[in-house]
Each structure stands twice: as C-alpha cells, then as structure tokens.
Amino acid sequence: MNASSASTKSFFHVPPDGNPVAVPDLGSALEALRGGGYLWLNLIDPAREDLEALSQPFGLHPLAIEDCLDDEQIPKIEDYPANTFILFNKFHYEAQELFIDEVDLFLGKNFIILVSHNMHGDPSFLDRLEQMAGLERDNVLRGADYLLHVIMDYLVDQKFETIGSLRDEIDNIEEQIISDIAVFKPEDLMRLRRHLLKIRKSITYEREILVKICRKDSRFITEKSIYEFRDIYDHLSKFFEETDIYREMISSFMEMYLSMMNNRMTMLSNRTNRIVRRLTMITTIFMPMTLLSGIGGMSEWSMMTGPENWKIAYPLFLVMMMVVGAGSYFILKRLESGDRKEIE
C-alpha cells in the first residue's frame, strides 16, 4: 500500500472483502465508506486544521485533538461517544540517543485514525507500518479493531528492538569494566539508566492501556479481538521486567566500578606510602652521618685529629660513620618489623 501523498498523509478504504484501497483525499474516503468496510487514515505532523477537519465526520473530541498536538502527554486510553482515543509511544534508538515519539490512535465503529508528530530518525515509519499491514492482510480485513492490534503490535516490536540495542550496550560496558576500566566512562551508565527510566515509565502506562482493553472497557473493540491484545500485554510485561533487570545490572556495574576505583586508589596510596617510607629511611640514616661529617669538617677538629697528630683519625672517623649508618638502618628495620607484627 502506498501513501497518497508524500509521507504526511495516507488514506485507505478497507472494503468488507478485498484489499485495502488508497484514496486521494478525505472526501473520496468518506464516499468510499458508503460501500461498507472501514477507513484507515494516517496523518504525520498534521496541523490543527487537519485534525479539526476530521472532527465533524468522525466525532473527534476537542480534548483529544489537544492531546494530539501536545508532545508531553503520557500514554493513556479514553472513551468518547464516537470513538476510543489511545495514546501510545513509539521508541527509536540511534547513535546512543533514545527518541520517544507520540502515536495517537482513534478507533471508531468504521474507522481508525493514526496521528503522529516528530518521527525522529525514522522517516519511513509510515511506509513500514503500511507494509506490515499488507503482511497482516487477513487480520486487517477482519475489522478496524484488528488493525489497531496490528499497529500496536508493530509499535511494541520496535520497543523490543530498542531494548535489544540497550542490552548490547550494557554487555559492552560490562566487558569494559572487567577488561580495561581505564577506557570506561561512568557517564555511559548514567545515560543508559535515564533511557531505561523513560522506557519503564512509558511501558507502565501502556500496560494500563492493555489492561483496560482486555477487560472490555472500550465498546469499539470486539470480544473476539481481545485475545490478540492479551499477547501485546504479555510482551509489555516481559519488557517491563527486563528494564528492571537492566536497571539492577547498571546499579551493580556502578558499585563494581566504584569498588575497583577505590581499590586502584588504595594501591596508588600504598605505593606512595612505600616511596615516602623509603625516602624517610634514607633521610634518617644519613642524618647522624651528616652531623658527624659536619663536626669532622670543622677546622678545630681537623687541627686536633689531623694526620700529623693522629694518623688513623680519618680512617677511624669514616669507620665510625659507617657503623652509625648501619646501626641506624638495622634499628629502623627492627622498628618496621615490630609495627608489622602489631598490625597483624
């Protein structure tokens, strides 16, 4: 099925028996509806006037139209006299960025309308959705509520792709932490955590939508089609559990990272302490030797113990310095050994 205009609008009439037929405009769609079947209307980035033009023939409520124009709405389902309004989210993950786009659906007795804005990074969304509907031809011909299931199932499949991409990133981060913590960036964990929180929030509300559908809150969804929606609910429940698991994994990775960094800092601190201890030992050993050499270098001392007065004065002085240095070394080593025993 091909869109009737360049990826902004596509109108189809689904006859009671036959393939969906593209129609050029709204007037032609309403004319075709007189022959039975139902209409499938897609609008990407519509203006307010485009939505208000649908208000009269399909009974779109003004509040629902406002929701379509507001990008900050949460997923929900609301029943109006002429239709059921469903707000679902579409996920798209690319270049480590999570895009969440709002998809609004109006389901009536003989029509289904899809409205969406800001198809971030996914301009072919509508074309692929129409291709999917072509593959699900038998379900599409069964009624507008079955087409609603096809659309929602497609949106849930895209959630699976997004969660799969996040899972691959989490696995890569785990390998980085274990193999080479130096190349690991903790901000990657924070980014993934934010993405998972957004996904979890969206899925929480979307599960509530499926709960209301499955308990027959909408009169425009037949009892026979409810079994199809239960399958979507099962998938969302699975994704919800996976997001919780991945959040726990990220928390564990952060604890692991902090623990490894603490160990690394401890090792560096111990290394610094060893260096300082060695320098201190060298300084302590040479302090008395420096004192003796200072005394020995005095002119008065040299006059009293010079070679002409005492031939062995200088050799004896050197031996005394060596004895003092060796004695200082062994005393320091003994004290260090005693400190280690006390610690143990």
Protein language model features and the residues they cover:
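Hydrophobic alpha-helical transmembrane segments and their immediately adjacent juxtamembrane loops
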Residues: 237-344
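Peripheral, non-transmembrane regulatory/ligand-interaction domains of membrane transport proteins
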Residues: 1-224, 228-231, 235-245, 304, ...
